[in-house]
């Protein structure tokens, strides 16, 4: 059996689920990780009803650093080669900074930043030994703009973008691509559960984003932004004065 796998975090719903379905459709074996075991089982069942691949499930809360150690150890002990790691798991919150519980803010940092860093730290050496691999870190269009009322979330995604690009320069000499992929607003439960107000945004279909991400990963694109409208936001943030971008983005968030 082919022991090469694509590992996807946050795979029980939304973008992660769509990515799992897309990679499965292309014959990729999967390691799916999320907190909710029942939802993972449903994703697996639905995929295997139409795809002939191998799927491993791990029910872990990646905001717990020990869980990441257990995940990596399980992959090693089962001789699963992670040829592609997709760090998709993340959480967010919208509101005035001190109106959001500090614990919630710290959880955003723990999952969106610390867990992602540790996943890279543990799995990159294996890819380095193999002389090949792809790490795809899912950032966000908010990485380009300091969104008021999403201060910690947007800042966490700015970290992901900067970290990923720096990491790519370090590891490309080993045959490893570290890709940054930026979705915009997507029609998933993530945005509703985070309390984001989306009345001014036309959200993308997660399946459409998954197809885009698959192509970007297979073509080893180092940096990708989904949808033309999101590319315009990134360009707008780049060419206009920082003060102007900050003020306008705050009005957009209200």
Predicted segments, located by residue:
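Residue(s) in the substrate-gating loop at a strand-loop-helix junction
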Residues: 140
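Substrate-binding pocket helix/loop in short-chain dehydrogenase/reductase
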Residues: 96-97, 104-109
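Active-site helix of classical SDR
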Residues: 120, 156
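Conserved glycine-rich Rossmann-like NAD(P)H-binding loop of the short-chain dehydrogenase/reductase
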Residues: 26-42
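Conserved NAD(P)H cofactor-binding loop of Rossmann-fold oxidoreductase domains
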Residues: 88-93
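C-terminal helical subdomain
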Residues: 180, 196-234
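Conserved glycine-rich cofactor-binding loop
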Residues: 10-14
């Amino acid at each position: 059996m082919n022991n090469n796998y694509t590992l996807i975090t946050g795979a029980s719903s939304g973008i992660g689920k769509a990515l799992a379905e897309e990679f499965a459709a292309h014959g990729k074996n999967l390691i799916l990780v999320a907190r909710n075991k029942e939802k993972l089982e449903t994703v697996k069942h639905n995929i295997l009803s139409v795809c002939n691949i191998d799927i491993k499930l791990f029910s872990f809360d990646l905001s717990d650093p020990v869980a990441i150690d257990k995940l990596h150890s399980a992959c090693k002990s089962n001789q699963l080669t992670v040829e592609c790691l997709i760090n998709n798991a993340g959480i967010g919150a919208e509101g005035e900074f001190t109106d959001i519980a500090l614990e919630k803010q710290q959880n955003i940092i723990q999952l969106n930043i610390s867990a992602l860093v540790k996943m890279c730290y543990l799995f990159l050496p294996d890819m380095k030994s193999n002389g090949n691999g792809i790490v795809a870190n899912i950032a966000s269009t908010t990485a380009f703009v300091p969104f008021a009322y999403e201060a910690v979330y947007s800042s966490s995604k700015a970290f992901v973008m900067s970290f990923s690009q720096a990491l790519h320069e370090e590891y490309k000499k080993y045959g490893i691509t570290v890709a940054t992929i930026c979705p915009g607003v997507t029609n998933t439960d993530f945005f509703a559960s985070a309390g984001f107000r989306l009345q001014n945004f036309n959200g993308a279909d997660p399946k459409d984003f998954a197809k885009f991400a698959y192509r970007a990963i297979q073509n080893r694109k180092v940096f990708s932004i989904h949808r033309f409208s999101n590319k315009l936001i990134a360009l707008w943030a780049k060419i206009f004065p920082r003060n102007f971008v900050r003020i306008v983005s705050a009005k957009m968030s209200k």
